[in-house]
Amino acid sequence: MQEEVSRYQALAASYDELTVDVGYLRRADYLERQFRKSPVPVRTVLDLACGTGTMACLLAKRGYEVTATDASEEMLTQAMTKAAALTERPPLFLHQTMPRLRLLEPVVAAICTLEAVTYLTRPADLQETFRRVFRWLRPGGWFLFDVNTPWKLRRMDRQIYMDETEESLCVWRTFFSEKRQTCTYQVDLFRQRADGAWDRSFEEHRERAWTEEELRQALAEAGFTAVKLTGDLTSRPPKPTEDRWIITAQRPVE
């Protein structure tokens, strides 16, 4: 049986199995190193586009008060199931898109990991997301996010990737549009049912190849300062062949 659904619905149940090589612990360690550099002590954190909540739960286990948002109800269901096993204070999960961010109270740090910002394909949505993050950061607070680089997304044009687990098979077909500066992922997911039969679902994802100049301009227009762009999990400038950029920016102290 084949069914077409919107992004991160069918994939939600298999997402953790398909991303076992992400290295969440290393990324959490990196985030904490950045938090320690902040002149404002970081205790409250926003995890924007949190997915299945792995990073949000890791930070909660380390003592942070975490608010986590995502646009996919299915991903949030997985996240809340994961958080239910915590002995520490669990994250507060909110069902929101990035450009419609609205929190209960400001935070000292905001993160957006695993290239979620590249899912913002329209300049207006990118600008509004940055504006809202700025609005919900305390003065002196920090925004840290990563993106897939234009070099990586162009290199993915007309490629086929496969991920396989015991109960699922995921096939990704990718196409890059120079005109739109976007990479489209056509995803076929096959999941085995208890009776041995297989269900097939289709999702289409799209990411924008934002340039460094576009990101810096959008951050500046939102009010951010001290913008820094580095390679992945490092303090050095990115290489020309970098797959991922990490960007940090600060809301000025008022």
PLM features: what roles do these ranges have?
Residues 1-49:
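Conserved class I S-adenosyl-L-methionine
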Residues 46, 53-100:
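Class I SAM-dependent methyltransferase SAM/SAH-binding core
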Residues 102-109:
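A short acidic, Gly/Pro-enriched loop at the edge of an enzyme's catalytic core
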Residues 113-115:
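Residues lining the SAM
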Residues 127-139:
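A short glycine-rich, Lys/Arg-flanked "PGG" loop and its adjoining helix->strand segment in the class I
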Residues 144-217:
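SAM-dependent methyltransferase
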Residues 206-254:
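C-terminal lobe and adjacent flexible extensions of AdoMet/dcAdoMet transferase-like proteins
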